[in-house]
Structure formats: C-alpha cells, structure tokens
Amino acid sequence: SGKDSFIWPNSWIVLVGLMCFIVYLAEGIMLDWSALYLIEEKHIATAQAGLGYASFSAMVATGRFLGDGLVQMLGRVRVIVGGGLLAAGGVALSIISTHWGVSLLGFALCGLGCANVSPVLISSLSKQTYMPTHLAITAATTIGFAGVLAGPAMMGAVAHYSSLSAAFAVLAGLLLVVAAFGHRFK
C-alpha cells in the first residue's frame, strides 16, 4: 500500500537524527582528522599517528560490548548525558594536553563516551507512534550518517580558516549539545 511510502519525520525523529549526526560526526572526525591532528598539533611520529583512531575505535567497541549492562545499570538518560560529557571531555583533554599520549587518552575517552549514545537514541524511536518504527529509524539514521560523510569536510573548513584544534573544539561543543538534550530521553 502507498500508506507509508513517504512520511516527513516529526521534530522528535529529527532531534534523534541530529544527535546521531553529532555522534557520527565525532567518528568521522576521528577517522579523517585524528592522525593529522596528532602529527601537526602534538608532534607524534607519522608511523604512530594511526593510534588516535585506534584508541577511539577500541573504546567504542569496548563500550558497545558493555552497553546493555550500562543502560540497565545507569538508565538511558545517564548513558546519553554521561556519554556526551565524557566524549566532550575527552576531546577537550586532547586539545589542552601537551603530550600526544594524553591526546590518545582523550580520543579513547571520546570513543567510550560516544559508544552507546547512538544505539540508545535509535532504540528510543521504538517508543514513538508518529510513524512506523522502521521508517523512523531510517529517517534518523539517514540524518545521522550524514555526520560521517559531511562532517569531516565541514570540520576541514573550520581547520582551514583557523586550526585543527579549533575544529576539535567545535566537536567538543557539539558533544556538549548531545549531553544537554539527553534529559529528553527518559
């Protein structure tokens, strides 16, 4: 039937998508910019520059493996708010540190913070009744994945006109926005 062929997402679904956009933006920036950041800003050897994304990714994987238990223990709101704060704090730590090793720790904390935010956000769409769940998930993840695709280019523009540290500071600020809106997911 043509009943659910196209439905504009409502503001709740768009909010979930935008919050996922920010979290996926963090992943895209870590993938595309962390090595260059470590080389240019923290003076790490080129051969070790991949450690930035590796530390981020390892903690995303670890966090996801522990995710169900964390959500049961802490609840959805604390996972989103705490994850946003931890991720923002990790990025901030990487900016203010003077040693690349501390920046790696910051990237790891960012990964741990981001790990369960998007899964919790996406799972929240099962509670909405505006549109069929599969369409709501599709709409939100489409918005979210634009963060991986377009985000690094946007941050590249920020870095071009200022610095890589400024681009990472923008990311930290956006992750604080995720934390600020986390209370809406009770």
Feature map (PLM): residue ranges:
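Intracellular juxtamembrane helix-capping segments at the cytosolic ends
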Residues: 115-129
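Helix-breaking motifs and short loop linkers at transmembrane-helix boundaries and internal kinks
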Residues: 43, 75, 96-98, 130
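Paired small-residue
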Residues: 90, 101-109
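Structural signature of the two symmetry-related core transmembrane helices
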Residues: 78-93, 169
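Multi-pass alpha-helical transporter architecture, strongest
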Residues: 172-186
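Helix-to-loop junctions at the C-terminal end of transmembrane segments
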Residues: 63-75, 159-160
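Extracytoplasmic gate region of multi-pass secondary transporters
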Residues: 10-57, 61-62
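A late C-terminal transmembrane helix in Major Facilitator Superfamily
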Residues: 129-164
